[in-house]
């Protein structure tokens, strides 16, 4: 267990039970950290997550060379066996607002209401993360062969759990263009290369030194054969002769001011994710983010709190 992620970082043995129950919505980084913290203090913790295994994007989005799956699973095992944390997988929590679709929703076999959890627990913590990719807002993003970062990465890790309705993006022998320079974009480029892409080109609107993932990560990808184009601003995604599938990316060279057309079979827009809690209005999350609350991170519903990416 020495390589396990230490979610229960406060103590080696659990404290005596204090008789209080807490529900955590989401089993990603913030949810598991909250479960470990509360488990150490003697709370009975129930974790609800839509995916088939705990870990969130650590397990279902980030490639294994960055975060090995066995480290996550060992940490979860410790939470469950030693600290009594119960995990309710494949469970989607909703509110009165209509459900919106996100990556991984098809795994859910059970849908429960937030009100139920509030009634059954002394407190609820929403750690549902950021499961919606930002859009560029340029023409052609709806074409076949265009993916967001999550749409590209999620199936690669999820396919082992649901082969019938999840498929890995077909990139073998093709040209893949990745827009963005954060860690997700680096993960996309690395994964495309590992899946056998003939050519991987990274496109960024600033310079390598300004890449959010750091110039070191960019250099690592260049070393394995990826190409890097900087100071490029995407203008539109060009369709093929059928008008249905991507054929190229049209962009502006920020140095020369000229317009360029880069041929592509697959384009991945990886410019960040945004939180999509299904109860945003009901909980008054804008006020929570501004700090206009009675208790730190408590929503407009008594004893319902938020943590992690939901706060961003």
Per-segment meaning from a language model:
Residues 3-22, 113, 156-172:
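A short, basic/flexible loop-to-alpha-helix module at the beginning of a structural domain
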Residues 18-21, 90, 172-175, 231, ...:
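Phosphate-coordination loops involved in phosphoryl transfer and adenosine-cofactor binding
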Residues 21-46, 185-193:
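N-terminal Rossmann-like FAD-binding beta1-loop-alpha1 element of flavoenzymes
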Residues 22-24, 45, 176, 200, ...:
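Conserved hydrophobic helix-helix packing surfaces used for dimerization/oligomerization
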Residues 28-30, 53, 182-184, 274, ...:
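Residue-level detector of alpha-helix initiation sites
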Residues 43-59, 201-208:
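Glycine-rich FAD pyrophosphate-binding loop
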Residues 70-135, 160-165, 194-289:
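A Rossmann-like FAD-binding core segment of flavoenzymes
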Residues 142-172, 263-312:
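FAD-site-proximal beta/loop scaffold in flavoenzymes
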């Amino acid at each position: 267990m020495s390589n396990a992620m230490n979610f229960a970082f406060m103590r080696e043995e659990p404290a005596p039970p204090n008789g209080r129950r807490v529900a955590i919505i989401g089993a990603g980084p913030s949810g598991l950290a909250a479960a470990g913290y509360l488990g150490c203090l003697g709370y009975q913790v129930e974790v609800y997550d839509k995916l088939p295994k705990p870990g969130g994007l650590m397990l279902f989005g980030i490639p294994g060379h960055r975060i090995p799956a066995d480290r996550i699973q060992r940490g979860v095992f410790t939470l469950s066996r030693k600290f009594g944390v119960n995990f309710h997988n494949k469970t989607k929590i909703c509110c009165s607002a209509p459900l919106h679709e996100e990556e991984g929703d098809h795994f859910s076999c059970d849908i429960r209401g937030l009100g139920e959890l509030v009634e059954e627990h002394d407190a609820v913590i929403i750690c549902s993360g950021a499961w919606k990719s930002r859009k560029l807002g340029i023409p052609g993003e709806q074409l076949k062969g265009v993916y967001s970062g999550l749409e590209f990465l999620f199936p690669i890790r999820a396919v082992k759990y649901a082969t019938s309705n999840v498929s890995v993006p077909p990139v073998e022998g093709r040209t893949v263009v990745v827009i963005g320079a954060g860690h997700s974009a680096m993960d996309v480029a690395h994964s495309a290369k590992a899946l056998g892409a003939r050519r991987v080109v990274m496109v960024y609107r600033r310079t390598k030194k300004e890449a959010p993932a750091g110039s070191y990560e960019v250099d690592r990808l260049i070393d394995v054969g990826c190409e890097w184009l900087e100071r490029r601003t995407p203008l539109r995604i060009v369709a093929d002769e059928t008008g249905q599938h991507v054929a190229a990316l049209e962009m502006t060279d920020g140095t020369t001011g000229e317009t360029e057309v880069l041929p592509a079979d697959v384009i991945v827009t990886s410019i960040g994710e945004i939180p999509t809690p299904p109860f945003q209005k009901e909980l008054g999350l804008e006020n929570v983010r501004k700090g206009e609350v009675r208790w730190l991170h408590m929503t407009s519903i008594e004893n319902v709190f938020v943590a992690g990416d939901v706060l961003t």
